[in-house]
Amino acid sequence: MHGLLYRCAAVALISMAFTSASPAADAAKPHHIAIQVDQNDPQVMNLALGNANNAIEYYRARNEEVDIDITAYGPGLHMLRADTSPVQDRIKRLKDQVFPGKIQFSACNNTKQGMEKAEGHAIPMLPEATVVPAGIVHLSELQEQGWSYVKP
């Protein structure tokens, strides 16, 4: 009797190991995309924003959720600076078209502090930007949580 019970339990465990989640369960999972911007280049910034917009539109058409985090650090922080961003209007439009909380613009505080020291004044950030302690650590932690990583 015990042998039969153990064999049934073993078969059940093996079956569960080789059974994937149903397509309906996969569709219910939100997608997570982290996009890195580390260059002070309007083309790279626009490419990152285009990637984000394309992902939003794609998943919206499929009635699926997507969370996007665009993290700017190093020279790429200019993307989120209120005084130097060449793409601030596009950032505002993108933020306005997306459900609140579905897109975040993360600004590296290490870079911000370095720029403030070098320039001798406070660096104004766009209102859409959220300052994170370290951009590279932020991206790394998102990846550890299962986010897909994109570098345009």
Write out the residue ranges for each language-model feature.
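N-terminal secretory signal peptides that target proteins for export/translocation
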Residues: M1-L4
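Secreted/extracellular ectodomain signature
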Residues: P23-P152
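Bacterial N-terminal signal peptides
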Residues: C8-A17
